[in-house]
């Protein structure tokens, strides 16, 4: 501590209140082909309505990926979604003669803004997809006598006609304002043709225009920063041409500038209908590289938290093996804090006479790992967006059941069985395995999804895909350790850069033991011990600037096999005499 050179009172505050923080363990992650939304940019979704708002309603091609995401959200409210597209995915636009642009996200836009302007485009749909073809941008300029505004069918969305902004007035310039409306011309977004999606009143065509609070009021800046539907690339010739004393849109304000239109249709609304947007037509089997690129966005655990990685729907066994084994590598080697959930490929279980044998063959190609959970089925559900029945992998619902287990019990409880393992919102299964078929599946590390009379459709197994006998061959144990490891690792950050002495070690133990006692009290652990003393922090360890703690845990085990012995005895037998006999 610092010493005073004269009498003084020194006040110090010392924080010894460290605890093991609570951590979430139910965030899902999925990659898919969607109709709308940013590409290769994880978006956290909380329910199906938000999924539609962010990624659009599905068509008959991407409905499988959409509903896989939607069915996970039936059980919980945290799903990281990454959209991927193929070469058919393109943004709708107006103007220009070059091929349709592909703008994936804001970063991509910032790199291509000037190029889009040079290509002669005025407005571009925010995201790739045919949905953008439904958009129209209407711009109301200043006009003499406000004739354009007066005759505009959308003028009731604005308080007054555009004129001269305060910024231009202060610089002796005039007529720089415009109103902008983005309209659902085709009705694809709202179901109503001509519905106004968003409005932007009193914008300026001057590139340096500011509002009273100092933020940009330039039409390009405002639309590109705030619009949910379009990018503004550049102006058409009516706006960008300098004619006489008229100043061109997109230039800075000079004294005497008049931005009023003098060419083209000067007293009417400018309408920019977008076209040529395209949807991806990819199936997963033919676009493995795209899907793997999407899942790569989940690799960095320091930047994004995921707990349940849902493998996508695939049509072939080869594609399934490639994707699943790549995801297991990410979970087990790269992140070490999540599990992968997968179902067999479509062709192995839907409309086939040998789904059990096929499922076993597919599962045998996967990496043996406690970070992988495999189920056996596909779910028949109703697609309300396209009025059809479809089959989707059970994996997303299996992951949802695991996430919901966290809420109704804890991560260290088994997600299987009638209490927590019920599947929601399904019409039927691709097939229901018999008892002997369930035995075959379970021996192969596959958790049966079965329709049991009187109980409904249940997850009827809680194995991981670890081939060797171990505590980690059960889902609840694997997830217990993931939660404990994540939480204690966060608490251990407070040890960094401290001294490796008795005080620091005692403080660490004092933080960790109450956390583990709580889990023991909640039935996740039968016993534990924390070793962090001079026995494992030897002088050699200390001299290497290291700190070691050994955390020994006896995990609770789920019941998989129940035996009920019914014993008939003579009338005169004392039950106490035979109660302890093994049967």
Predicted regions located by residue number:
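Structured, hydrophobic secondary-structure cores that serve as assembly/anchoring elements
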Residues: 1-110, 121-122, 126, 179, ...
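Extended, beta-strand-rich, solvent-exposed assembly scaffolds of outer structural proteins
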Residues: 51-55, 90, 100-211, 218, ...
């Amino acid at each position: 501590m610092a010493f005073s050179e004269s009498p003084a009172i020194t006040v110090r505050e010392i924080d010894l209140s460290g605890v093991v923080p609570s951590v979430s363990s139910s965030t899902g992650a999925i990659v898919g082909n969607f109709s709308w939304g940013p590409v290769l940019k994880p978006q956290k979704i909380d329910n199906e309505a938000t999924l539609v708002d962010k990624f659009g309603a599905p068509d008959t091609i991407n409905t499988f990926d959409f509903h896989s995401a939607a069915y996970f959200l039936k059980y919980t409210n945290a799903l990281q979604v990454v959209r991927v597209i193929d070469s058919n995915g393109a943004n709708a636009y107006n103007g220009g003669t070059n091929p349709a642009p592909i703008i994936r996200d804001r970063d991509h836009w910032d790199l291509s803004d000037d190029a889009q302007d040079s290509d002669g485009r005025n407005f571009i749909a925010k995201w790739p997809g045919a949905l953008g073809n439904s958009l129209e941008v209407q711009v109301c300029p200043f006009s003499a006598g406000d004739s354009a505004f007066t005759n505009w069918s959308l003028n009731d969305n604005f308080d007054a006609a555009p004129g001269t902004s305060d910024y231009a007035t202060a610089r002796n310039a005039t007529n720089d304002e415009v109103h902008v409306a983005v309209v659902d011309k085709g009705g694809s977004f709202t179901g109503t043709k001509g519905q106004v999606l968003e409005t932007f009143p009193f914008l300026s065509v001057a590139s340096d225009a500011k509002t009273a609070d100092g933020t940009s009021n330039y039409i390009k800046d405002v639309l590109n920063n705030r619009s949910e539907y379009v990018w503004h690339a550049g102006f058409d010739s009516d706006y960008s041409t300098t004619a006489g004393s008229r100043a061109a849109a997109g230039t800075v304000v000079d004294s005497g500038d008049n931005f009023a239109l003098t060419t083209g249709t000067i007293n009417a609304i400018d309408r920019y209908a977008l076209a040529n947007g395209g949807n991806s037509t990819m199936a997963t089997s033919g676009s493995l590289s795209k899907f793997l690129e999407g899942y790569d966005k989940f690799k960095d655990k320091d930047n994004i938290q995921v707990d349940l990685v849902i493998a996508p729907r695939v049509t072939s066994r080869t594609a399934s093996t490639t994707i699943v084994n790549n995801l297991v590598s990410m979970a087990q080697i790269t992140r070490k804090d999540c599990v992968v959930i997968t179902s067999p490929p479509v062709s192995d279980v839907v409309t086939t006479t040998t789904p059990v044998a096929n499922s076993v063959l597919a599962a045998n190609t996967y990496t043996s790992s406690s970070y992988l959970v495999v189920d056996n089925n596909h779910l028949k559900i109703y697609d309300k967006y396209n009025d059809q029945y479809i089959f989707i992998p059970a994996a997303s619902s299996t992951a949802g059941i695991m996430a919901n287990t966290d809420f109704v019990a804890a991560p260290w409880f088994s997600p299987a069985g009638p209490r927590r393992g019920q599947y929601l919102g399904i019409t039927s299964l691709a097939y229901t395995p018999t008892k002997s078929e369930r035995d075959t599946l379970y021996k192969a590390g596959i958790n049966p999804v079965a329709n049991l009379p009187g109980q409904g459709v249940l997850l009827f197994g809680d194995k991981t895909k670890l081939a060797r006998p171990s505590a980690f061959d059960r889902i609840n144990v694997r997830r217990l350790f993931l939660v404990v490891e994540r939480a204690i690792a966060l608490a251990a950050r407070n040890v960094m850069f401290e001294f490796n002495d008795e005080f620091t070690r005692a403080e660490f133990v004092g933080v960790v033991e109450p956390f583990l006692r709580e889990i023991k009290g909640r039935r996740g652990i039968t016993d534990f011990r924390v070793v962090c003393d001079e026995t494992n922090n030897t002088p050699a360890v200390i001299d290497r600037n290291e700190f070691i703690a050994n955390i020994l845990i006896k995990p609770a085990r789920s019941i998989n096999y129940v035996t009920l012995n019914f014993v008939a005895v003579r009338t005169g037998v004392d039950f106490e005499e035979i109660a302890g006999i093994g049967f």
